[in-house]
Amino acid sequence: MCKVEEFYDFKNGLNKEKEFFGSGVPIVNFVDVFHNRGLTPEMLKGRVTLSKKEIKNFEVKQGDIFFTRTSETINEIGYPSVTLGVPTDTVFSGFVLRGRARSVDPMDNLFKRYVFFTESFRNEMVKKSSMTTRALTSGTAIKEMYVQYPSSKDEQHKIGAFLAQIDDTIALHQRKLDQLKELKKAYLQLMFASTNTKNDKLPKLRFTGFKGYWELCK
């Protein structure tokens, strides 16, 4: 068991006025980190106009681990996301914290996608974060947290790849579920007659062999 500070340094993100946003270089925003445990360049939709110096100061590299810095509730503070792809001229928002290995990263990137979202790490995150009007964490707080991992990167990668495969399966079934819900919604409109008396008392779609108007009762 090791403290996070043994391997990672943390940096606060970029703060700019709203007129700088909308075009420019990609930026890792709060919602990107909050909703995804792993990030690839094509997932980043936010853009910000910056100088070369600012891009250098707030650059994003493959393997960087981000944490949401603030939240409305304490249970949603410090959600993690790791950079899985190779970003180009990409920066990160002031609403997230960037963790980066000081030298050689002891953890596989796929493994990092999950190790900072385990129940034990989440519990520690909640305990060591502050709560006033909003929940808040910091690089200083995260560096004091403990993390456990196998020394073998091969084992780490197998764990990460296995869990990623489950996530992919869940996402596939979720898409199928969403499609079924939309299909059901469409059939509800087609297979039931309208209660509007000005419309025909017939559904637009019926099973073969059934005829006649539907009864309209008050």
Set out the residue ranges of the language-model regions:
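Short, ligand-facing micro-motifs at secondary-structure edges
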Residues: 34-46, 65-93, 110-114, 123-127
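Short acidic/His/Gly/Ser-rich catalytic and metal-binding motifs that mark active-site loops
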Residues: 35-40, 136-138, 198-200
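Sequence-specific dsDNA recognition surfaces
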Residues: 5-17, 32-65
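Short, well-ordered beta-strand elements within core beta-sheets of diverse protein domains
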Residues: 51-52, 97-103, 144-148, 205-210
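Non-catalytic DNA-recognition/assembly elements of restriction-modification systems
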Residues: 1-14, 206-218
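Amphipathic alpha-helical segments with low aromatic content
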Residues: 145, 152-217
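A short glycine-rich beta-alpha junction/loop motif
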Residues: 15, 89-95, 122, 129-155
